[in-house]
Structure formats: structure tokens, C-alpha cells
Amino acid sequence: MKKGGTQIEKDVFDTFQTEIGAFVSGGVYLQGTRPHNSFEEDCVIGFLTGLDKDIQEGKVNINFYVPKINAGAQKKIKNIARILEIEAFICGLVTRITNEYRFYQEQTIHSFEEDDKQTLVNVVLRYKRFSNY
């Protein structure tokens, strides 16, 4: 049986939620459900795109929101040490194989300035979904 984007997003969320939840100090959310005013170290998982073939293929987005650290004089800077930890964590996580899914890193993990309080670490995973239905 084929699955839609929201179902695939939820499957990926269910696959990684426990490990990511233990790793981050904030919460793990589906796309569009992270509290707007959160400045915690959160993770958001979202469906990007998919091809509906015998083996469904596509991409999912995993974003980590990393609070900036105080550099003194009211200046906040990117938390490089924590971003490196997240990158290493994700590299181990993407090797996960389930009965239904295979995951591959689509592109180099990168970070950019979300705002003056947090940095966004972006991971794009490619998936292949195998179904015997």
C-alpha cells in the first residue's frame, strides 16, 4: 500500500523520535507543530518530496534549532561545539534501517543563522520505502 507525505513524515518521526528526544534538551516535533516562541534546542522533522513508484523514494528534512551561547557584552554567538556534536549524532543516525525504510544522507549537513538567538542545523535525508502490500 502506498503512503502519503504526512504518513511518511510520521513514520520518520516515529523512527527517530526516541533517540533524538534523548539527545536534544528541548522537544521533537513534526513540521508545523513546534511552538512559535520556543528558543529551546528543538528538532523538527518534515516531509519534503516523494516519488510514488513500486519503491517509494523521497526526501525528509530534519532541522535542529541550537540556541546561541553568550560571548559576553550582550553578544550571542553560534555554538560550534554543540553543532559538531549534532553533526556526528546525525551521521550515526542515518545508517538506521527498518523493515520498511532505508535512509541515506542527501547532502552535507549545514547550519545557518535562524535569528539572533538560535542557529539552524539542516539535514536532508533521502529515503526508500519498501512495501510488501
Model-predicted regions and their roles:
Residues 1-25, 46-133:
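Charged, amphipathic alpha-helical segments and their flanking helix caps
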Residues 28-39:
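Short acidic low-complexity segments
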Residues 38-47:
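A short, hydrophobic beta-strand-centered structural micro-motif
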